[in-house]
Amino acid sequence: MLGISQISNRWLAIIGLVTLPLVGLSVAYEFWYAFLVPPALLVVWMTLYRLDWAMWFIVFATPISINLTDLTGGAGLSLPTEPMLVLVTFIALIKMALLGEFDQRIIKHPISIAIYVYLTWMLFTAITSQLPLVSLKQLATRIWFIVPYYFVLAHLFLKSDRNKLTFLWLFLITLTVAAIYTLVIHSQYGFTKKTSTWVMFPLFKEHTSYGAVLAMMYPAALYLTFRKSSWGFNAVAGAMLAILTLATVLSYTRAAWLSLVGAGAVYLVYL
């Protein structure tokens, strides 16, 4: 009986043997889209055998993902995260329903039960909807966002406290990249309030969602900056905090500013 590591190594070898000729043929016939096949197969392999790696990649890529609706006006699809979310959801549901690999504390948690009720109600209303296909698509979208971001991450967080720090670092690093991109574009227009509504495009649709994400992750950057750690990690976290501070101010999102003031007030109450 082969172990998981042996099976995964065998599949990696098969992927390599299949993709090498494809790359050669794509060069010979100048069919450049074939170069997308190797990373696509690697993503499938990673999702099947290392669900944690796949989830960390999704977390890392989320702040810099691009929505095709914004660029083409077609079907809404965020790349590269959304196809992976679908794969992770499929594997996670199999592990939850058939293999029982998820912590029962997550499955039976009151928030989880509330989610089950919410999705069941969505299914009922989708069936009775005037446009059932549209409603079912909306339900499917909800499922492939909720399962990875709630159930899979909760499983990883319960598995190890280090995973919580991994999540914060991965998300904040690319959020800082997105903030730098926005600041550079914004600087070309003199940091005016009028242009602040769209300079974060295509990473964020407009400044409201951009400011909301900055405000939500600002306390995390603050925590990483002042937690007991090596000076190198604290210095990097401090640099990210400075960039996110500037980005939050120049987002001209009053709701984000007020939420940070409110969060600070709550912190002082419990200090």
Set out the residue ranges of the language-model regions.
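N-terminal signal-anchor transmembrane segment
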Residues: 7-95, 124-128
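Membrane-interface micro-motifs in multi-pass membrane enzymes
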Residues: 29-33, 75-84, 138-142, 202-216, ...
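Membrane-interface helix-loop-helix junctions at transmembrane boundaries of multi-pass membrane enzymes
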Residues: 47, 51-53, 94-114, 224-239, ...
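Membrane-interface helix termini and inter-helical loops of multi-pass transporters
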Residues: 70-71, 130-135, 190-201
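Aromatic-anchored transmembrane helix interface
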Residues: 81-87, 110-121, 132-156, 175, ...
